[in-house]
Amino acid sequence: MTSIPFPGDRLLQVDGVILCGLTHKQAVQCLKGPGQVARLVLERRVPRSTQQCPSANDSMGDERTAVSLVTALPGRPSSCVSVTDGPKFEVKLKKNANGLGFSFVQMEKESCSHLKSDLVRIKRLFPGQPAEENGAIAAGDIILAVNGRSTEGLIFQEVLHLLRGAPQEVTLLLCRPPPGALPEMEQEWQTPELSADKEFTRATCTDSCTSPILDQEDSWRDSASPDAGEGLGLRPESSQKAIREAQWGQNRERPWASSLTHSPESHPHLCKLHQERDESTLATSLEKDVRQNCYSVCDIMRLGRYSFSSPLTRLSTDIF
């Protein structure tokens, strides 16, 4: 019957959810949620003095009566709403070359405490395909039956074979859950336990997210590895600097015998001295040949100061 709750009434059920065994906090949460109308089952105690014909078997001072009440309440959480309370409807689809044009997921009952069994939900509608063109199907709808066969109790592979093995025309019995009864498809399942489908989705996302990182790492290795650095001529440039700086020191000090018999690398102390002045200059092979084998007029005049019988003079004339 429909009535108004009175103080002292005992609340037994909210929209079919039995409150027996729930804590006070859980019971309060059941009275909050997105729904505007809720069905309550109350237990009302009727004092014995108000009864006209008391029962002979009544040993208690009052009588308890179950009262069914439909009343408007503020929003309630999804845990207190039956997911199959939404409107049920049938949709007929004809397969094309790509099938029915939608994907589905199986939401295990362990993922949500208020589910009585696994649910098969439509995850995505593909543009231009039969399911999307039908216009009556939406992501998140629950598939209750396929061509009259219930999906309750079926595992994911069985539902898949049921849809793939269906004839050209398929009749789907769908149910659209009340708002807030189940997580939105875009948000996946916000539950502490992972369903089989979510584990598969997470594995797929991990593969797709790590692949670009591997590609970037490979390209980084190709462009910035130590081997590649050597290939860019980093070490030859340092040796060229040493040659330039050693030759510059030779022109300043002119120890002729030692400069012609020793390699430029034998003067490491000259590198530091010349680094600030000649850092931007690149020594070419021609410049090295000129510096090693040719001398200026000043060098010749400087040679005149020495005796022509000296070894340095003989060595210089041999070079010229």
Swiss-Prot record:
Residues 215-239 are annotated as: Disordered. Keywords: Repeat. The keyword Repeat applies. It holds the Pfam family PDZ. CDD domains: PDZ3_PTPN13_FRMPD2-like. InterPro entries: NonRcpt_TyrProt_Phosphatase, PDZ, PDZ_sf. Residues 1-46, 90-178 form the PDZ domain. It comes from the Eukaryota. SUPFAM superfamilies: PDZ domain-like (SSF50156). This is Putative protein FRMPD2-like. It comes from Homo sapiens (Human).
